[in-house]
Amino acid sequence: MHFIIGIVICLSLSVIQSNTSDEGMCMAKEQCTDPEESTTGRSLYSADYNKYFNAIETALAGYVACNSTNCNCHADVLKADLKPFKAHGITKEMINRAKQYGTHYQVIGHKLYRQRECMFPARCSGVEHFVRPLLPLLPDMDLIVNCRDWPQIHRHWSKEKIPVLSFSKTAEYLDIMYPAWAFWEGGPAIALYPTGLGRWDLHRQTITKASADWEAKEPKAFFRGSRTSDERDALVLLSRAQPSLVDAQYTKNQAWKSPQDTLNAEPAREVTLEEHCRYRFLFNFRGVAASFRFKHLFLCRSLVFHVGDEWQEFFYPSLKPWVHYVPVPVRSTPEELEALITFFQEHDQLARAIAERGYEHIWNHLRMADVECYWKKLLKRYGKLIRYTVERDSTLIEV
């Protein structure tokens, strides 16, 4: 596959760089422009196109498929997250300091206990779904599980090592990542999914079934979502200017009060995950933290454009830019987005190859079995770091 893609890249580069004659044509490294050509003309993209070709070629040359055995595709993440505690382990004092940052759980005698009040019951329930089957394998331990959207332990604010489990973080945080509750239940609640997305196992089946053949997909970019941040505005504005290139519109969220909240337009209707599969190019933006939508988009066998690389979930590092998805800088302008989308419209084989690799990776390495495997590895290795005798907290309830 890499050999074939390499041929496509080389042939495409040769077309771009062939304009070297003296008959009014520019040299390869010059900016090829025609005074009568539209400012959005194809020749203005040549520098960007070279950049994209080179990025894809470099990424593929250095790519080594991960080992799917025993969820090892995600092993480096777990190793890095637990590294701060490797030398001296986890002490009772650390747990006491961590309690303010999340929900307190205990595993005692292969039973699970939790503080009575849970800020987000569906999220706690999703966590407990994955922990309960592992109880016969686990030693006694205290766990502080953060079910909020935002990570808690900033590396520059916290001088002490504090073990808090969170589903998502950036490089600025030292939280220990766990597979989110939303693999089972909870997640963003919208009208179409009033109790949250949940049930990754079922979505894997329904979205894949809804995926249209590549040729049948509309060759345009697509996005639906609320205006969580203005990082999404450039794509929406491009859509309004060039609806044949992009269909990107804002939907309502709980804070919506007027069209001003949807960039001075009426909110669009929400669409199911399956409806996304009609389109060849799908954009993913972060929300408050990492996007729950991200993993679902790959199941459409469409090309995923992932905006920003700051926010992570446990499985993100196994996905490689330009190999499995197209990376997009956070503050891209409408013009930059236009160039990127147009490139993949005009280089359909490259787009399809990246889309297929992205689908295969998620399908093969983010099964529910992989999620359960990661939970198992996480809790067993975490348990080995406990350096004190865990005593039952009588204020906790069995769950």
Swiss-Prot record:
Glycan attachment points: N19, N67
Keyword Nuclease: no
Superkingdom as given in the UniProt entry: Eukaryota
Signal peptide span: 1-18
First-listed, main subcellular location of the protein, grouped into a coarse class: endoplasmic reticulum
Database matches in SMART domains: CAP10
Region (Interaction with the consensus sequence C-X-S-X-[PA]-C in peptide substrates): 189-194
Subcellular location: Endoplasmic reticulum lumen; Secreted
Site location (Interaction with the consensus sequence C-X-S-X-[PA]-C in peptide substrates): F120, R227, Q254
Molecular function GO labels: UDP-glucosyltransferase activity; UDP-xylosyltransferase activity
Pathway, per record: Protein modification; protein glycosylation
GO biological process assignments: positive regulation of Notch signaling pathway; protein O-linked glycosylation; protein O-linked glycosylation via serine
EC annotation from Swiss-Prot or TrEMBL: 2.4.1.-
Positions annotated to bind UDP-alpha-D-glucose: R224, G225, S226, R227, T228, R232, V271, T272, L273, A289, A290, S291, F292, R293
GO cellular component terms, A-Z: endomembrane system; endoplasmic reticulum lumen; extracellular region
Active site location: D149 (proton donor/acceptor)
Disulfide bridge partners, by residue number: C66-C73, C71-C373, C118-C124, C277-C300
Keywords for this protein: Disulfide bond, Endoplasmic reticulum, Glycoprotein, Glycosyltransferase, Secreted, Signal, Transferase
Protein purpose: Protein O-glucosyltransferase. Catalyzes the reaction that attaches glucose through an O-glycosidic linkage to a conserved serine residue found in the consensus sequence C-X-S-X-[PA]-C in epidermal growth factor-like repeats. Regulates Notch signaling by glucosylating Notch in the ER, glucosylation is required for the correct folding and cleavage of Notch.
Family: Belongs to the glycosyltransferase 90 family.
Protein's recorded name: O-glucosyltransferase rumi homolog
Organism: Anopheles gambiae (African malaria mosquito)
